[in-house]
Amino acid sequence: MVFVNSRHQGNHYEQMAADYLRRQGLTLVTQNVNYRFGELDLIMRDGNTLVFVEVRYRNNTQHGHAAETVTRTKRARLIKAANCWMLANKMNSHSADFRFDVIAIHQQGQHIDWLKNAITEG
């Protein structure tokens, strides 16, 4: 598939990830939440648990797994963005049940890995 730009490509794979997670029983809360310091790709619910999902794509695994591209800096930005989103929605990390997952997509969507609790605070 040919994409006009990286944002178009990102939207395509984020939608693929959302559809995949829906088939696994999660429900979409919102997507593409932007803050000046970071973005939340997908926010889903898995029962009573709020799930912040980072979607990563690599055409192939020759240079590593897509999940390996979630750097320490990226993890810190995701945690900060999630805390901001929870505060804006009258929640906080002490009262809300939440986790950070990564959806790693390879080979134009032919292979999808779902890593639950892939990002932990601290």
Swiss-Prot record:
One Pfam family matching this protein? UPF0102
Example GO molecular function: nucleic acid binding
Q: Which family does it belong to?
A: Belongs to the UPF0102 family.
Q: Which organism was this protein described from? A: Vibrio cholerae serotype O1 (strain ATCC 39315 / El Tor Inaba N16961)
Q: Which InterPro entries does this one have?
A: Restrct_endonuc-II-like (IPR011335), tRNA_endonuc-like_dom_sf (IPR011856), UPF0102_YraN-like (IPR003509)
Name it: UPF0102 protein VC_0580
NCBIfam families found in the cross-reference section: PRK12497.1-3, YraN family protein
